[in-house]
């Protein structure tokens, strides 16, 4: 009897399993809702074991059990998300081509682009939901919303109404909802013009609802599902935006300090064109909202956490999806609604930390300690430290965190909480904090954890605290040799090839002329770039402090050779330090005179470098009171005019140094180089200096008026007759 022909391999096995499952699915009855099977005792034990394993990995995290959620919390979606259909091949190709045209932004003016957007809207009529849910075209919908006026926003908003519960949970459509909320917020106070219902060219009626009414419709649509959407991976981001819009708070997704910022989100930027104002400022500013928004916002915030007891509410603090929403709730509760809301026992902050004293061993102190070293929970603690009322923050700092600020600054996670604490400390507390942190400075410098010393320097400058002890701690953390100390500060290694390289000719060619290989230093990893960036920011902060702190940097700079200074000028991060050293108010004319002479003979290659060109620009202001040095530098640039004009960055240097004026009208350039024009422009409305003949005329007129005023009787008549 012949054997059954069988295919070997994992792919064939998976294919057969897939066919079997498909066959079983076709044989089963098509019930709309699947029955829920009661878990057995074995399954219950297995789930408990898995939960215990997770708790061992992260003791602060408590999973939210599905069975313990509030009834009606999970939306009734009948099993699956609704399917709005797919775009056909021609439609998809058209919208992708429209997306490319908007990215290229080759429109002559704003009116031409507006006409193009109108044509895309007319083509998208009736297909808005398909486009929003399309992986390839959802970005086009975001761009269209970003370029829309109030009328177009109302149209697209009306298309989404009734579908928001599903759209906010969709991977691609949720971003469209978020963009719609952000751009509709500034126009929410505009009143709808009272016009009779009319049909446009496509036969579509104008929506009757205003944008404010549409936002209220969104709230009504989502009101039964806030608790579920709180931890939904796609909806939570959109819910955060909605909460901030209802509160009238700015929503800036590009800011790192924003509650809606995300490293994974692809930022869609709309370039401006001629005749169009940049609209980015409106998103970063507060806006007025209707009176109906505030009670609706309070109800949303109450409903979100009403179905959770205090234990699970605290579990959200370490939940990667729920934590950002909890941050927004605390921010609105503590800053938007005032201090009175923080005293309410039912408020979110009081449920998280019921004991306002934060004494050691209390429930609140235990909760705070659990957040300090957690990568997710520490972000919530940052929000609490930043926005807590003054009395609560003082109790938290003095009873819980103040004595540990030195050890907390050593930790890479808790260090960010230390930054927020330093921002709120007064002068006396800041002195004590600096004394506690100073012993840890050498270890922080060694491990490249420089954010705490940098923030400490900045806050001492703001509060007027003497930074001499901190300067001594920093000096002890680096080498005693000034030349080596600067290399340690900036994480900079001196290369053997000291000749500066222009970036216009950064490729070298083989003898045969075929292969071109990049020359210069090897590529730097992201971690090394971050270390260099933080090191540069720390040194720049040190340069702003007069006294021993800035002298520590200046002595190191003056100990370097000209070749090393030129290499520093060509590094993107260290060049910022040179710019700061040349233009800072702490640099004396003696320091600038010694430092600027190091660049003579290297100005042209520096001017052809993208980083070095900024240093050359800084030399203009650095030599404001050293005219002979500035004139020599201008002569050096003049000798290489053609090289500078052939380079993009070189032309910028030529323009910033007013070299055309130097060649043609040397006297005018001299006046500008010495700052005479700036002094004249600074005194707006002041009269120009009088010439000597004008001064003589003024003296004669004044003497004549005095003589007229002194004459009396007959003498006055005689003077008048003259």
UniProtKB/Swiss-Prot annotation:
Output the Gene Ontology terms for molecular function: RNA binding
Purpose of the protein: RNA-binding nucleolar protein required for pre-rRNA processing. Involved in production of 18S rRNA and assembly of small ribosomal subunit.
Chief localisation class: nucleus
Q: Name one Pfam family in it.
A: PUF_NOP9
One GO BP on record is: endonucleolytic cleavage in 5'-ETS of tricistronic rRNA transcript (SSU-rRNA, 5.8S rRNA, LSU-rRNA)
Q: What keyword terms does UniProt attach to this protein?
A: Nucleus, Repeat, Ribosome biogenesis, rRNA processing
Locations listed in the record: Nucleus, Nucleolus
> Which residues form the Pumilio repeats?
123-158, 363-398, 400-435, 556-597, 598-635
The UniProt regions of compositional bias labelled Low complexity, in chain numbering, are: 698-714
Entry's family note: Belongs to the NOP9 family.
Q: Where is this region: Disordered?
A: 1-54, 496-529, 676-722
Q: So which residues are the signal peptide here?
A: none
Name the coiled-coil region(s).
Answer: none
Spell out the GO cellular component terms annotated for this protein, sorted alphabetically and separated by semicolons: 90S preribosome; nucleolus; preribosome, small subunit precursor
Q: Which InterPro entries match?
A: ARM-like, ARM-type_fold, NOP9, Pumilio_RNA-bd_rpt
Protein name, as recorded? Nucleolar protein 9
């Amino acid at each position: 009897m012949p054997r059954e022909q069988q295919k070997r391999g994992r792919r064939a096995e998976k294919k057969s399993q897939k066919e079997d499952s498909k066959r079983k699915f076709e044989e089963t009855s098509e019930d709309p809702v699947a029955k829920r099977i009661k878990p057995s005792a074995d399954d219950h034990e297995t789930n408990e074991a898995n939960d215990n394993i997770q708790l061992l990995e992260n003791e602060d995290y408590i999973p939210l059990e599905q069975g313990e959620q509030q009834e009606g919390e999970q939306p009734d979606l009948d099993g699956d998300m609704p399917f709005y259909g797919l775009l056909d091949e021609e439609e998809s190709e058209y919208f992708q081509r429209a997306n490319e045209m908007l990215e290229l932004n080759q429109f002559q003016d704003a009116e031409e682009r507006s006409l193009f957007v109108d044509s895309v809207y007319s083509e998208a009529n009736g297909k808005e939901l398909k486009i929003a849910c399309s992986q390839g075209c959802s970005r086009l919908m975001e761009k269209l919303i970003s370029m829309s006026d109030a009328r177009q926003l109302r149209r697209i908003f009306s298309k989404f109404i009734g579908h928001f519960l599903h759209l906010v949970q969709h991977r691609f459509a949720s971003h469209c909802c978020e963009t719609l909320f952000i751009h509709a917020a500034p126009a929410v106070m505009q009143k709808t013009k009272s016009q009779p219902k009319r049909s446009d060219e496509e036969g579509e009626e104008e929506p009757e609802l205003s944008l404010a009414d549409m936002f209220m419709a969104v709230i009504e649509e989502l009101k039964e599902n806030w608790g579920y959407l709180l931890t939904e991976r796609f909806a939570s981001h959109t819910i955060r935006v909605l909460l901030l819009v209802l509160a009238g708070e700015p929503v800036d997704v590009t800011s790192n300090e924003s509650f809606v910022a995300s490293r994974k989100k692809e930022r869609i930027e709309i370039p401006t064109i001629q005749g169009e104002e940049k609209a980015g400022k409106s998103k970063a500013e507060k806006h007025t909202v209707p009176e109906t928004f505030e009670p609706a916002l309070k109800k949303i915030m109450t409903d979100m956490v009403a179905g959770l007891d205090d234990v699970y509410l605290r579990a959200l603090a370490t939940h990667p999806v729920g934590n950002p929403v909890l941050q927004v709730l605390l921010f609105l509760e503590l800053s938007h609604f005032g201090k009175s809301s923080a005293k309410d026992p039912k408020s979110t902050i009081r449920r998280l930390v019921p004991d306002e004293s934060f004494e050691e061993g209390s429930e609140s102190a235990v909760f705070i300690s659990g957040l300090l070293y957690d990568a997710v929970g520490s972000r919530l603690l940052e929000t609490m430290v930043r926005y807590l009322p003054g009395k609560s923050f003082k109790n938290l700092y003095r009873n819980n965190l103040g004595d540990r600020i030195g050890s907390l600054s050593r930790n890479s996670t808790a260090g960010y909480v230390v930054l927020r604490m330093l921002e709120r400390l007064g002068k006396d507390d800041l002195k004590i904090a600096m004394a506690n942190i100073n012993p840890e400075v050498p270890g922080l410098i060694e491990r490249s954890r420089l954010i705490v010393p940098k923030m400490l320097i900045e806050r001492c400058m703001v509060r007027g605290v003497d930074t001499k002890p901190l300067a001594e701690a920093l000096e002890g953390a680096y080498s005693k040799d000034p030349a080596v100390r600067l290399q340690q500060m900036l994480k900079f290694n001196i290369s053997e090839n000291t000749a500066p390289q222009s970036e216009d000719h950064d490729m070298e060619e083989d003898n045969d002329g075929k292969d071109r290989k990049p020359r210069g230093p090897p590529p730097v990893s992201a971690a090394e770039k971050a270390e260099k960036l933080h090191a540069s920011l720390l040194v720049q902060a040190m340069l702003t402090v007069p006294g021993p702190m800035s002298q520590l940097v200046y002595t190191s700079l003056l100990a370097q050779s000209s070749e090393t200074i030129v290499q520093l000028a060509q590094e993107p991060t260290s060049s910022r330090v040179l710019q700061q050293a040349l233009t800072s108010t702490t640099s004396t004319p003696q320091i600038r005179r010694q430092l600027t002479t190091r660049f003579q003979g290297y100005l042209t290659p520096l001017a052809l470098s993208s980083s070095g060109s900024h240093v050359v620009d800084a030399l203009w202001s650095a030599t404001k009171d050293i005219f002979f040095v500035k004139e020599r530098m201008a002569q050096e640039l003049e000798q290489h005019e053609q090289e500078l004009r052939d380079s993009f960055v070189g032309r910028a240097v030529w323009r910033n140094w007013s070299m055309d004026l130097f060649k043609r009208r040397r006297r005018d350039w001299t006046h500008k180089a010495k700052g005479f024009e700036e002094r004249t422009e600074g005194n707006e409305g002041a009269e120009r200096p009088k010439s000597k003949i004008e001064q003589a005329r003024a003296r004669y007129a004044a003497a004549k008026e005095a003589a007229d005023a002194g004459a009396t009787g007959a003498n006055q008549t005689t003077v008048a007759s003259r």
